[in-house]
UniProtKB/Swiss-Prot annotation:
It comes from Anaplasma phagocytophilum (strain HZ). This is Large ribosomal subunit protein uL18. One of its GO terms (biological process) is translation. PANTHER family: 39S RIBOSOMAL PROTEIN L18, MITOCHONDRIAL, LARGE RIBOSOMAL SUBUNIT PROTEIN UL18M. CDD domains: Ribosomal_L18_L5e. This is one of the proteins that bind and probably mediate the attachment of the 5S RNA into the large ribosomal subunit, where it forms part of the central protuberance. Keywords: Ribonucleoprotein, Ribosomal protein, RNA-binding, rRNA-binding. One of its GO terms (cellular component) is cytosolic large ribosomal subunit. Belongs to the universal ribosomal protein uL18 family.
Length: 121
């Protein structure tokens, strides 16, 4: 990525986070690289991560290829849903923090899978 692209991504990330701060104290943050995808449910009031899942886990590594794709991301969404469902009902409603990533591709596939599993955001 060029320096211009990095600056534009940083501005987009800050803009998204600023808007999310006013909405809710519980957010689902995602990070993706070329090889892996990470998602974590963060309680900003308590300052801690409530639940997390990624493509580094053995259930996903057995199925996924060397690069992150929609199939692997759907498995990560199911793992995260299992971990959240065991928690308090307040954690079923949160805001989706896509960071600097556009809502397309694996980010959109992850969000759609979570919505189909009954989460509201």
């Amino acid at each position: 990525m060029s320096l211009f692209d990095l600056k534009r991504a940083e501005r987009r990330r800050r803009r998204v986070r600023l808007k999310l701060r006013s909405l809710s104290s519980i957010r689902l943050s995602v990070f993706k690289s070329n090889r892996h995808f990470y998602a974590q449910l963060i309680d900003d009031e308590a300052g801690r991560t409530v639940a997390a899942a990624s493509t580094l886990e053995s259930e996903v590594l057995a199925v996924a290829s060397r690069r992150v794709n929609a199939g692997a991301v759907k498995i990560v969404a199911k793992l995260l849903a299992e971990r959240i469902s065991g928690l308090d009902a307040a954690y079923r409603k949160f805001v989706f923090d896509r960071g600097s990533y556009r809502y397309m591709g694996v980010v959109a596939a992850f969000a759609d899978e979570l919505r189909s599993l009954g989460f509201e955001f």
